[in-house]
Amino acid sequence: MARWYRLGLMALILVMVWGCSTAQTLPEVNPVQPRFTKAGDGVITDHLTGLDWYVNPNPDQKFREAKAWAEGLTVAGGGWRLPTMAELKAIYQKDASAYHMDPLFQVKGAWVWSSELRNDWSVWGLAFYNNLQGWHSMDYGNGRVALAVRSRR
């Protein structure tokens, strides 16, 4: 019995010594960074996916106009394009706001264009207000908005 007592006491001492030395080497805790941050030039960085986003202020754009706007955007060095459906779905946030995305985006349209063509005359898009994926004629612009995206630089 004395042997078990000594073993238990030694184990307890080892745990206490090891625990104390480990506690002294733990890294300093940093405050939690928000998923999205917005720079002064309007670029929104998604720290989870590593993508940069930029919102087109015009809420009524046809697909070709939206695509030309994104590809011609020179903010923060250029390299912009329209997002894929997967990229759009990645920023959807069920409980974020009426539009179900971070308020930093301040999107004014009902539907957001993607870069994915359905056929020669229609394109896929996402309605953030109800998470509905659908396709629309390239020539329809009412309530359609563009977001530009690029890999973070």
Can you name each region flagged by the protein language model?
Residues 2-81, 85-153:
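Glycine-aromatic-enriched surface loops/turns that form tight recognition elements
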